[in-house]
A protein has these predicted regions:
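Serine-centered coil/turn micro-motif
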Residues: 76-78, 122, 146
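Short, flexible, solvent-exposed loop/turn segments with mixed acidic/basic and small polar residues
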Residues: 1, 58, 81-87
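N-terminal beta-strand motif that seeds the catalytic metal site of vicinal oxygen chelate
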Residues: 1-20, 89-96, 146-152
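Core segments of cupin and vicinal oxygen chelate
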Residues: 1, 11-56, 60-64, 103-106, ...
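A short, acidic/glycine-rich surface segment
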Residues: 33, 76-81
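Short, solvent-exposed interaction modules
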Residues: 82-110
């Protein structure tokens, strides 16, 4: 498996509103997307952009790795359990892009890695799946099909 672009770092939070204030006021984030619900996954999500590569003029292009803020919706046991262990929230997962989600899934399975569920539509509108942290150096890892042009 060839390592793809780091698309985002997922951060579980008990309050997206409080996390937005933190990234804006403490970390200086200037582009924070509107939060939205993903009922199929039981979460509310908000993306915070980080600067992309320098253009050489001191300015940054868009397209840096994003922070994905994740707040559980009622009934979401997995994120709620994470927050019970980590009441202030914290890093939940990392997400890498691949060109073909089904080929990536087959490769990971052939290596004996535990895929957590079938590919499904994620927050960027592309197919995703997760890999068990015990098989990934202790890190819950999301694999996502690279977004179409213009999407992040």
């Amino acid at each position: 498996m060839k390592l793809g672009r780091l698309n985002h770092i997922g951060v579980a939070t008990p309050s997206i509103a409080d996390s937005i204030a933190f990234y804006r006021d403490v970390m200086g984030a200037t582009k924070i997307h509107a939060p939205f619900d993903l009922p199929d996954q039981g979460v509310k999500v908000c993306f915070v952009d980080t600067p992309g590569p320098s253009t050489g003029s001191g300015q940054s292009e868009s397209g840096g790795t994003q922070i994905e803020l994740i707040e559980p919706l009622p009934g979401n046991a997995s994120i709620a359990a994470f927050l019970q262990k980590n009441p202030a929230g914290g890093q939940h997962h990392v997400c890498y892009e691949v060109p073909d989600i089904h080929a990536a899934k087959a490769e990971f399975e052939a290596m004996g890695k535990r895929v957590l569920g079938e590919p499904r539509i994620g927050a960027h509108g592309t197919l995703i799946f997760f890999l068990h942290p015990k098989d990934m150096g202790g890190v819950l890892t999301e694999i996502m099909e690279s977004p179409k042009e213009g999407a992040h």
